[in-house]
Amino acid sequence: MDIIFYHPTFDTQWWIEALRKAIPQARVRAWKSGDNVSADYALVWHPPVEMLAGRDLKAVFALGAGVDSILSKLQAHPEMLKPSVPLFRLEDTGMGEQMQEYAVSQVLHWFRRFDDYRIQQNSSHWQPLPEYHREDFTIGILGAGVLGSKVAQSLQTWRFPLRCWSRTRKSWPGVQSFAGREELSAFLSQCRVLINLLPNTPETVGIINQQLLEKLPDGAYLLNLARGVHVVEDDLLAALDSGKVKGAMLDVFNREPLPPESPLWQHPRVTITPHVAAITRPAEAVDYISRTIAQLEKGERVCGQVDRARGY
């Protein structure tokens, strides 16, 4: 069994050694331009077209939760990956836990009004504020996949009203489910906090725009943990300036790194993190990949395969 590996920033040698230990029967090598030697599996992130083009692979593994970088390149270069080759993503290799930590900490930050107290502190102003009530602090999760499910589970502990929206209806205990564009307005109407965990597809690009934000209750909060392309940043800034949106926590952006001249940096109601909400944990990723390859070699059914038509 031959495995090729490519990631522009990961510690390649660590990965190769870890994969060799986890899959002793495999010959693992770092792919370099000009390497056309056959392989069975490819582990990639932002792969060059020539790495995958023409190969008879058993599977390709994207080294992250998203596959939009591969699918967008595949649209421009359909020869890059044969239709018969299954594409897998890291469905949850510690990312669910990280998303839970991030989402819960920020929801509680807003619920206890720490953002307001920080603004008061900046002007040396001492003033206790009225508390928010749980029953009025509905949290909506936009995108109901594996990570959305994990976030919902963690928030249930805090007894907030929860709802989710996705392409198809879900049956999550304690979570009100909305499905399809025809139910999006009803979903948004009660969301004091909107958590975005949508996949990046042509249908979801720019979905968080003026029209969507206007359907939220006044003074709502936005937590974007998915992709920057989901948010029309000028529309969000306008909603923040008007008070329609009271605060935004943003981990992802249309351009990354976020340019220094972006007005998001200086906005008093925006908090920024540099795309760190859920990063790939190498040891857990290697464990998932090795187990999945073992299942594929046995002809077993496995989870995490991407539907290329849907984009996730």
Swiss-Prot record:
Its EC number is 1.1.1.79, 1.1.1.81. GO terms for cellular component: cytosol. Signal peptide: none annotated. Its main location: cytoplasm. It holds the Pfam family 2-Hacid_dh_C. It comes from the Bacteria. The active site is at R227, H275. GO terms for molecular function: glyoxylate reductase (NADPH) activity; hydroxypyruvate reductase (NADH) activity; hydroxypyruvate reductase (NADPH) activity; NAD binding. It catalyses: glycolate + NADP(+) = glyoxylate + NADPH + H(+); (R)-glycerate + NAD(+) = 3-hydroxypyruvate + NADH + H(+); (R)-glycerate + NADP(+) = 3-hydroxypyruvate + NADPH + H(+). NCBIfam families: PRK15469.1. This is Glyoxylate/hydroxypyruvate reductase A. It comes from Escherichia coli (strain SMS-3-5 / SECEC).
